[in-house]
């Protein structure tokens, strides 16, 4: 489904990874590991099509993402360090905007069934990330951690097959981590893919998670 083929990347005359190859199938949850500066964020950005490698390629459904860009981005949801939250909109309006922007790509979920979206689903998504009662607050008046929660709420209304998440658990409490773990498992059980970085321990049962380590 997603393959990284002989990917090499050099930044500031330092090799981050060289001839890196791996394949991710539907229904997999993958954590990219490595020390600070190992290239985790760089790798995720390259896979998301937001950065360039020095050599190698990333393929989606056996086709390079540059040539399959339109189909790839219909399947991809990327959450990076920048939340992409619009400060002039409320938390609720941010989710409504996201839903409207991606309406064509969420007409059906991965099982072919119409998704249950709309007003109620947006309120529920914000409640899931601990923002109940803050739905009508302008995002610019929320803390950085709360803005990140608004961004994470998109996951509850997304039917994108591939989720690429850079440190999604930052500033999330233990209960919030458990909620996200449950969501990740639900997504992969439906045939989705989750590719993430995190400094937090996840899943007592390691069978749920495959790790790829950089900087070895």
UniProtKB/Swiss-Prot annotation:
Q: Which Gene3D superfamilies match?
A: P-loop containing nucleotide triphosphate hydrolases (3.40.50.300)
Q: For this protein, what is the EC number? A: 7.6.2.5
Membrane-crossing residue ranges in chain numbering = none
Q: Which domain of life is it from?
A: Bacteria
For this entry, list what GO says about its biological process: cytochrome complex assembly
Task: Please give the coiled-coil regions recorded for this protein.
Answer: none
Q: What is its main location?
A: membrane
Q: Which PANTHER family match?
A: ABC TRANSPORTER I FAMILY MEMBER 1 (PTHR43499:SF1)
Name of the protein: Cytochrome c biogenesis ATP-binding export protein CcmA
Organism listed in the record: Photobacterium profundum (strain SS9)
Provide the organism lineage as a comma list: Bacteria, Pseudomonadati, Pseudomonadota, Gammaproteobacteria, Vibrionales
> Which gene name belongs to this protein?
ccmA
